[in-house]
């Protein structure tokens, strides 16, 4: 068993809502870690005071979309100027929101004034960039989107540096948004993350005793950070890369909930916090609707030598145990710091200690089903190739699929698709067969490492839904041994989630 070393690095990643609502609590958590003998490396997401749609990142994506519209209508200068006024207004709102937060929380006048100057300069830089793009008709591509979105994390870091300095904790702003050489590549290489971790570690070590406050947005990522396979949630990945680069043994993911739950506690009042979970379970929950931990962050944490432990904790209850992501038997656990687990559960890293019951149940909304029946007598593989080629042309990935020789049903996340896109895909697919589209659906998933050893669990799950008249449009089991999923009408999603949780978790009926 390995004990925690004094003065060891710990990567502390704070979500945007934590920084938006509780910046004082965040600062106290960092201060406590430092005074307790740790070396905290603080990774910040972009601020959000409530729903994601109103957060800084969402506003910056509005700036990006508005700028694309401006550049696309060079023949209409009046409309361009109207749109640019709207763009300026969004940036002004972002600046004013950040400045108001600084004025509310920072007590020392010199720190407050200095931080407001930095925030104003950052927002002016963003405005200057958009103005240049409009004037010179620049290509507003994925790289441009990355540049604009990166300002959200920069502004969060400005605030948190000020919060720490206001508490007499020396802190340094660390911008990772353009620190990795891009080599002008369009696709991620397998060794990109290893190179990035080394660069991050070197930069953070250069802080020389000051607490590094690090932008969760990092780059340059070949292609684009936002539009690549990484996407939003990248700050989790950044935290793990920082930890790997520093040879840290722990990553803490700080949220506004106690840890990872058996179901979303906002929808299921009886949901309970899990003391531990496997990386594969966490990845499945993330994919199927629960905002747990970025899947690449989980993968890299377990592959690291030694593996990096991940703790999910509540920023409002820092004394709580939270949830620890525990590697499975197939992972190298020789250096895993098992002494960080609940001392009352010393066997919690052993698969034999896991109860034969599901780990969690989750819902993924904004799902649309496409049912396609081939109208040709061609071989099935030719039919499937054409279907998936059409989806690839529209940058659409499939969440669930069910197939026969001449029929395929696909569940697709339509949250970022407008009705015209869905119609275009439907028209293209109609060239290959009869198409039926079912909107307003949801994926209901039962997740657990022990599902493969639980005889009859699928039948029990579907029987519970059937008894309550929940119609099942699709069933998927087999691609993953730890997941049973089905697609149901969205209107029944919350009811179905609570029914399954009550029967399989609260009553412990298995």
From Swiss-Prot:
Tell me the Pfam families matching this sequence. Answer: AA_kinase, ACT_9
Q: How is it used?
A: Fusaric acid is phytotoxic to plants such as cotton and banana. It has been shown to induce programmed cell death in plants. In addition to a mild toxicity to animals, fusaric acid exhibits acanthamoebicidal, antioomycete, and antimycobacterial activities.
One GO CC term on file = cytosol
Q: In which pathway does it act?
A: Mycotoxin biosynthesis
A biological-process GO annotation: lysine biosynthetic process via diaminopimelate
Query: What is the documented disruption phenotype for this protein?
Result: Impairs the production of fusaric acid.
The organism's place on the tree of life at top rank? Eukaryota
- Top-level EC class as recorded in UniProt: transferase
A single Gene Ontology MF term assigned here is: ATP binding
Q: Where are the transmembrane segments?
A: none
Question: Domain ACT spans what residues?
Answer: 372-440, 446-510
For this protein, what is the EC number?
2.7.2.4
| Catalytic reaction(s) noted | L-aspartate + ATP = 4-phospho-L-aspartate + ADP
Keywords associated with the record = ATP-binding, Kinase, Nucleotide-binding, Phosphoprotein, Repeat, Transferase
Record family assignment: Belongs to the aspartokinase family.
Instruction: Give the protein's biological function.
Output: Aspartate kinase; part of the gene cluster that mediates the biosynthesis of fusaric acid, a mycotoxin with low to moderate toxicity to animals and humans, but with high phytotoxic properties. L-aspartate is suggested as fusaric acid amino acid precursor that is activated and further processed to O-acetyl-L-homoserine by cluster enzymes aspartate kinase FUB3 and homoserine O-acetyltransferase FUB5, as well as enzymes of the primary metabolism.
Protein name (record)? Aspartate kinase FUB3
Q: What organism does the UniProt record list as the source? A: Gibberella fujikuroi (strain CBS 195.34 / IMI 58289 / NRRL A-6831)
* Annotated gene: FUB3
């Amino acid at each position: 068993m390995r004990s925690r070393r004094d003065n060891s690095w710990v990567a502390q990643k704070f979500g945007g809502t934590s920084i938006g609502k509780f910046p004082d609590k965040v600062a106290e958590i960092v201060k406590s870690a430092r005074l307790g003998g740790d070396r905290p490396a603080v990774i910040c997401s972009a601020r959000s005071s409530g729903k994601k749609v109103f957060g800084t990142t969402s506003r910056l994506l509005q700036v990006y979309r508005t700028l694309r519209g401006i550049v696309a209508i060079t023949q209409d200068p009046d409309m361009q100027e109207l749109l640019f006024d709207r763009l300026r207004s969004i940036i002004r709102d972002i600046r004013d929101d950040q400045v108001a937060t600084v004025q509310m929380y920072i007590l020392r006048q010199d720190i407050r004034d200095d931080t407001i100057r930095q925030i104003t300069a950052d927002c002016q830089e963003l405005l200057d960039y958009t103005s240049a793009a409009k004037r010179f008709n620049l290509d507003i591509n994925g790289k441009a989107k990355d540049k604009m979105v990166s300002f959200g994390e920069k502004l969060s870091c400005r605030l948190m540096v000020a919060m720490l300095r206001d508490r007499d904790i020396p802190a340094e702003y660390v911008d990772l948004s353009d620190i990795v050489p891009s080599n002008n590549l369009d696709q991620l290489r397998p060794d990109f993350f290893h190179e990035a971790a080394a660069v991050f570690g070197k930069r953070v070590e250069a802080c020389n005793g000051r607490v590094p406050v690090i932008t969760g947005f990092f780059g340059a990522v070949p292609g684009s950070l936002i539009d690549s396979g990484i996407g939003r949630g990248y700050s989790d990945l950044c935290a793990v890369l920082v930890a790997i680069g520093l040879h840290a043994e722990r990553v803490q993911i700080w949220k506004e909930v106690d840890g990872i739950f058996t179901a979303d506690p906002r929808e299921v009042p009886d949901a309970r916090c899990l003391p531990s979970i496997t990386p594969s379970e966490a990845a499945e929950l993330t994919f199927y609707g629960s905002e747990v931990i970025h899947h690449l962050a989980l993968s890299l944490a377990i592959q690291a030598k030694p593996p990096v432990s991940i703790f999910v904790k509540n920023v409002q209850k820092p004394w709580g145990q939270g949830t620890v992501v525990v590697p499975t038997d197939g992972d190298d656990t020789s250096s895993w710091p098992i002494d960080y687990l609940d001392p009352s559960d010393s066997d919690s890293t052993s698969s034999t200690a896991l109860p034969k019951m599901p780990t969690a149940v989750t819902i993924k909304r904004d799902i649309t089903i496409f049912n396609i029946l081939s109208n040709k007598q061609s071989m099935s593989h030719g039919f499937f190739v054409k279907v998936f080629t059409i989806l690839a042309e529209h940058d659409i990935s499939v969440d669930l699929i069910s197939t026969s020789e001449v029929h395929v049903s696909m569940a697709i996340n339509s949250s970022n698709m407008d009705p015209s896109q869905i119609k275009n895909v439907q028209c293209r697919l109609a060239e290959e067969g009869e198409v039926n589209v079912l909107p307003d659906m949801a994926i209901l998933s039962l997740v657990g490492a022990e599902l493969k050893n639980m005889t009859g669990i699928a039948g029990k799950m579907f029987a519970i839904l059937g008894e309550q008249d929940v119609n099942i449009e699709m069933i998927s089991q087999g691609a993953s041994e730890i997941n049973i999923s089905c697609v149901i009408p969205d209107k029944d999603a919350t009811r179905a989630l609570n029914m399954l949780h009550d029967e399989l978790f609260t009553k412990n009926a298995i």
